[in-house]
Design a protein with these regions (language model features):
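Extracellular beta-helix/beta-solenoid repeat scaffolds
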Residues: 17, 29, 44-46, 209, ...
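Surface-exposed loop/turn positions within long extracellular repeat scaffolds
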Residues: 1-36, 54, 61-62, 74-132, ...
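Solvent-exposed beta-strand/loop surfaces, strongest in extracytoplasmic domains of secreted
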Residues: 40-44, 50, 104, 132-133, ...
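C-terminal segments of enzyme domains that contribute to small-molecule binding surfaces
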Residues: 53-57, 149, 245-249, 344-348, ...
Length: 795
C-alpha cells in the first residue's frame, strides 16, 4: 500500500500505476497524470483522499475495479476510462468528468457526505447509472452543461447547482429530494424521466425545471419553490404525486398540463401561464396569495375527494372549462371564478364558498352537482346549463351580460331556485319543462327571452323583478312571496297563467298602456296587487278565491271576463277600470279604500256585477252609461260618489248596501233581490227612479229625516219595504203595480202624488204618514197589519 495522503502523479506517457496485484483496497491522495499514462485497478478499489485537487488525463482500467473520491478536493478525469466497478463519492468532494466515459462503465454511487459531479467539457453526457445512498446528496451542475443518461436510483438526494443545465435522459427512480438552486436548470431530455418518488424544490431565484424536451409525461412528488423560479412544461404534462404537500411561488409555463395525483396539498402562489389541462385526481390543488392558474387551462377533478381550493387567493381566478365527478369540490372562498375557453365542461361536484362563478367562454358548462356558492352567477357568453341532479344556490343572483349568453335549465331534473335574474336583450333563459324560482330581497331586470314548453317562473322573494323581453315559456308565472313583478310588454309573462299563493305579490308594468292577456288565478288567502306608476291592462280571466288590490296612481283596466270570489280593494288615488269586453267579478266585494280611489265602468260594453260595494268619502264610482249590479249576501257602506249619465245601480243581493255620498248617476236604482238599501242623504240614489222587480227589497235611511225625491216604480209582483229605524220621506211619485210595505218602528212620510195599484201594508209599530202635498194612491188597498200600525193623515 501507499501512504493514504500521498498524491500520485503519472507525469509521462507510458507511465503506469498498477494496483491490480494488491490484496487490499488502496488509498492515496490526489491522482494526476498525462494522457497516455495508465492506472490499472484490476479488481481493487482506489480511494482518493485528502484535500488537494488533481487532474488525470490518462486511462483508468480494471475489471471490477472501482474509484472512490473520499476527500473534499476536486478530481478531474479526462481520459477514456474502462474500469467497471463503479465510482463512489463519499466525502463531499467534486468529481469533474472530461468525457462521457470518464467514470468507466460502472455506476456512480454516493454515500456519507456524497459529493459534486460536473463536466469540464460543455455538453458531456454520462451514461453511468447513479445510486444515491440514503442520507447522501449528489450535487450536479457547475459551469458546464451536463447530461445524465443513466438511471438514478436510491434513497439519497439530488441537488442541481448552476449556472449550467443538467439534463436527465434516463428513467429515474430515486426517492430522495430534488433541489434546484438559484440560476440552475434541471432539464429532462428525450427518453428521460423525473423520479415519481422525489419531491422537487426550486430553491433560488432563476432556478428552472425544464421539461420541454421530454418525450413523455413526467411525474414527481410535491413541488416547492420561491418567486423568480420557473417550470417549463413545453407540451408535456407534469404529475405531482405522493403524500407530501408543497408550495410553489414560481411560474409554471408551457402548453402542457399539470396533474395532481397525491394525497397532500399543492399550493400555487405564482402567476402560472401553462395552457394545458389542470387535472386533480386526488388531494388538493390550492391557489393562494397572488397565485393564479392560466385563464385558458381547463380544470378536471376526476375523483371524489379531489379539491380545487381558491379560498386563499388574493384576486379573482380564471380557468378554462371545469369538469369533474360527484364528491369533488371547488372551494371559492370569497373569490370569483371565471370559466373561459371554447370547450365544453360537465361538473358534478360542489362549487362552494361566498364567491361567484362567471361564464365567459363560447362553449357550454354543465353543472350536475348541488352547488352551494352564494356569490353572483354571471354569464358573459356561452351557455351555463344545469343538468340532471344539478342546482345552483338558492341565493345566487344570475346575470346574463352578453347577447347570446344562455342559462339553460332544460336538462335539470328538479325545480331550480336562484336569487334575482338580470340580463341584456339577446340573452336567453331556457326553462325547458322546469320551474325557476327567484328568491331573496334583491331586484333584477331581465331584457332577454325566457323560453320553455311547460316551464314556469316563480317570484318567491320580496324584491322587484322586471321582465322586458318577449317571453315564450308556457308553464305560467307564480307570485308567492310578496315581491313585485314588472312587465315590460304584453308577452313578458309568456303564455301561461299568472298564479298567486301565499303572500302573493304585486304586478305592474314599466311601459304605460301594456296589456297582459294571461289568465290570472288568485289562490286562496293570497292577494295580487296591481297598478304602480304606469297604466296596466289585464285581458285574461281572473279566477280563484284570492283577492285583488289596485294600488295607483295608475289605472288598471280589466278587459277579461272575471270570476274570482275574493275581495277587490282600490287604494288611494288608484283607478280600476273595466274596458270593452271586460267584466267585474260578480262574486267579489269591491272596496274603494282611499280618497281618490276610482271604479270606472264608463268604457265597459256590458252591464257589470260585483258583490257588496264599500268605500270612503272622496272615492268615485263612474258608471258612465252602464248598469252596476251589487249581488251576494254581503253588506257594504259606500261614502263616495256614484256618477254616470244613464248609469244605473241594482241591488240584487240579500245584504244591506248603505250609500252616504252625493250621488249623481241618472239611470236609476233597482231593488230586485230582497236586499236592503239605506240612503245617507237625499241624493244618495242619484237622480233616476227607484225601481223594484222580482223579490224587490227594503229602502231606508241611515240619517233620520232624510227625504228622497226620486220617483219610484213598483214592478208587478214585487214589494218595496220602507222604513227601518230612522224616519224617511218619499217625495217622488210612486207608480206601478207592485206593493208598498212599511216596516218601522220609524215613520215613512209620503209627499208625492202616488199612483201605484199594488197593496199598501203597514206593519206593527210602523207609521205611514202623508205629508204636505202628498197623497195616498187611490188604487191601492191599505192594510194596517200589526198592533201599533198607524196611518197618519194629519200632517
Amino acid at each position: 500500500s501507499l501512504s493514504s495522503s500521498s498524491p500520485v502523479n503519472l507525469a509521462g506517457a507510458g507511465a503506469t500505476f498498477d494496483v491490480s496485484g494488491a490484496t487490499t483496497p488502496q488509498t492515496t491522495g490526489t491522482l494526476s497524470g498525462v494522457a497516455g499514462s495508465t492506472v490499472n485497478l484490476g479488481s481493487n478499489n482506489l480511494t482518493l483522499g485528502g484535500t488537494g485537487n488533481g487532474t488525470y488525463g490518462g486511462t483508468i482500467a480494471g475489471t471490477g475495479g472501482s474509484l472512490t473520491l473520499s476527500g473534499p478536493g476536486t478530481e478531474t478525469l479526462t481520459g477514456t476510462n474502462t474500469y467497471t466497478g463503479g465510482t463512489n463519492l463519499t466525502g463531499g468532494g467534486t468529481l469533474i468528468a472530461g468525457s462521457s466515459s470518464a467514470l468507466g462503465t460502472g455506476a456512480l454511487n454516493t454515500s456519507g457526505a456524497g459529493g459534486t459531479l460536473a463536466a469540464s467539457t460543455p455538453g458531456t453526457t454520462l451514461g453511468n447509472a447513479v445510486n444515491l445512498g440514503s442520507g447522501s446528496t449528489l450535487t450536479v451542475g457547475g459551469t458546464n452543461d451536463l447530461g445524465l443518461g443513466g438511471a438514478i436510483s436510491g434513497a439519497g438526494n439530488l441537488a442541481v447547482s448552476g449556472p449550467a443545465t443538467t439534463t436527465l435522459s434516463g428513467a429515474n427512480t430515486y426517492t430522495g429530494s430534488t433541489t434546484i438552486g438559484g440560476g440552475s436548470t434541471l432539464a429532462v431530455g428525450a427518453g428521460g424521466t423525473l423520479s415519481s418518488g422525489s419531491t422537487i424544490d426550486l430553491s433560488g431565484t432563476g432556478a428552472t425545471l425544464d421539461l420541454s424536451a421530454a418525450t413523455s409525461p413526467q411525474t414527481t412528488g410535491a413541488l416547492s419553490g420561491g418567486t423568480g423560479t420557473n417550470v417549463n412544461l413545453g407540451g408535456n404534462t407534469l404529475t405531482l404525486a405522493g403524500a407530501d404537500s408543497g408550495t410553489y411561488a414560481g411560474v409554471i409555463g408551457g402548453t402542457g398540463g399539470l396533474t395532481l395525483s397525491g394525497t397532500g396539498t399543492e399550493t400555487l402562489t405564482g402567476n402560472n401561464t401553462y395552457t394545458g389541462a389542470t387535472t386533480i385526481n386526488s388531494g388538493t390543488l390550492a391557489i393562494s396569495g397572488n397565485g393564479s392558474l392560466s385563464s385558458s387551462s381547463p380544470v378536471s377533478l376526476t375523483a371524489a375527494g379531489a379539491t380545487l381550493d381558491l379560498s386563499g387567493a388574493a384576486s379573482p381566478q380564471s380557468t378554462g372549462t371545469i369538469s369533474g365527478v360527484a364528491g369533488s369540490t371547488v372551494n371559492l372562498g370569497n373569490n370569483n371564478l371565471t370559466l373561459g375557453g371554447s370547450g365544453d365542461g360537465t361538473y358534478a361536484g360542489n362549487i362552494a364558498g361566498t364567491g361567484g362563478v362567471t361564464m365567459s367562454g363560447t362553449g357550454t358548462e354543465t353543472l350536475t352537482g348541488a352547488n352551494t356558492y352564494t356569490g353572483a352567477t354571471t354569464i358573459n357568453s356561452g351557455t351555463l346549463a344545469i343538468g340532471a341532479g344539478g342546482s345552483l344556490s338558492a341565493t345566487t343572483p344570475v346575470s346574463l351580460t352578453g347577447a347570446g349568453a344562455t342559462f339553460d335549465l332544460s336538462g335539470a331534473t328538479t325545480p331550480q331556485t336562484t336569487g334575482t335574474l338580470s340580463g341584456v336583450a339577446g340573452s336567453t333563459v331556457n326553462l325547458g319543462g322546469n320551474n325557476l324560482t327567484l328568491g331573496g330581497t334583491g331586484s333584477g331586470t331581465y331584457d332577454g327571452t325566457i323560453a320553455g314548453a311547460g316551464g314556469s317562473l316563480t317570484l318567491a322573494g320580496t324584491g322587484t323583478e322586471t321582465l322586458t323581453g318577449t317571453n315564450t315559456y308556457t308553464g305560467g308565472t307564480n307570485l308567492t312571496g310578496g315581491g313585485t313583478l314588472i312587465a315590460g310588454n304584453g308577452a313578458a309573462l309568456g303564455t301561461g297563467a299568472l298564479n298567486t299563493s301565499g303572500a302573493g305579490g304585486t304586478l305592474g308594468t314599466s311601459v304605460a298602456g301594456t296589456t297582459l292577456n294571461n289568465a290570472v288565478n288568485l289562490g286562496a288567502g293570497s292577494t295580487l296587487t296591481v297598478g304602480g306608476a304606469n297604466n296596466l291592462g289585464l285581458g285574461g280571466t281572473i279566477s280563484g278565491s284570492g283577492n285583488l288590490a289596485v294600488n295607483g296612481p295608475s289605472t288598471t283596466t280589466l278587459t277579461g271576463t272575471n270570476t274570482y270570489t275574493g275581495n277587490t280593494t282600490i287604494g288611494n288615488g288608484s283607478t280600476l277600470a273595466v274596458g270593452a269586453g271586460g267584466a267585474l267579478s260578480g262574486g267579489s266585494a269591491v272596496n274603494l279604500a282611499g280618497a281618490g280611489a276610482t271604479l270606472d265602468l264608463s268604457a265597459a260594453t256590458t252591464p257589470q256585477s260585483t258583490g257588496a260595494l264599500s268605500g270612503v268619502a272622496g272615492s268615485t264610482v263612474n258608471l258612465g252609461g252602464n248598469a252596476l249590479t251589487l249581488g251576494g249576501s254581503g253588506s257594504g257602506t259606500y261614502d263616495g260618489t256614484i256618477a254616470g249619465t244613464g248609469g244605473s245601480l241594482t241591488l240584487a243581493g240579500t245584504g244591506t248596501e248603505t250609500l252616504t255620498g252625493n250621488n249623481t248617476y241618472t239611470g236609476g236604482t233597482n231593488l230586485t233581490g230582497g236586499g236592503t238599501l239605506l240612503a245617507g242623504n237625499s241624493s244618495a240614489l242619484g237622480t233616476g227612479a227607484v225601481n223594484t222587480s222580482g223579490a224587490g227589497g227594503t229602502l231606508g235611511t241611515s240619517v233620520a229625516g232624510t227625504t228622497l225625491t226620486n220617483a219610484i216604480n213598483l214592478g208587478s209582483g214585487s214589494t218595496l219595504t220602507v222604513g227601518g229605524a230612522n224616519n224617511l220621506g218619499l217625495g217622488g211619485t210612486i207608480s206601478g203595480s207592485g206593493n208598498l210595505a212599511v216596516n218601522g218602528p220609524s215613520t215613512t212620510t209620503l209627499t208625492g202624488t202616488n199612483t201605484y195599484t199594488g197593496n199598501t201594508s203597514i206593519g206593527g209599530g210602523s207609521t205611514l204618514a202623508v205629508g204636505a202635498g202628498g197623497a195616498l194612491s187611490g188604487g191601492s188597498a191599505v192594510n194596517l197589519a200589526g198592533a201599533g200600525a198607524t196611518l197618519d193623515l194629519s200632517v
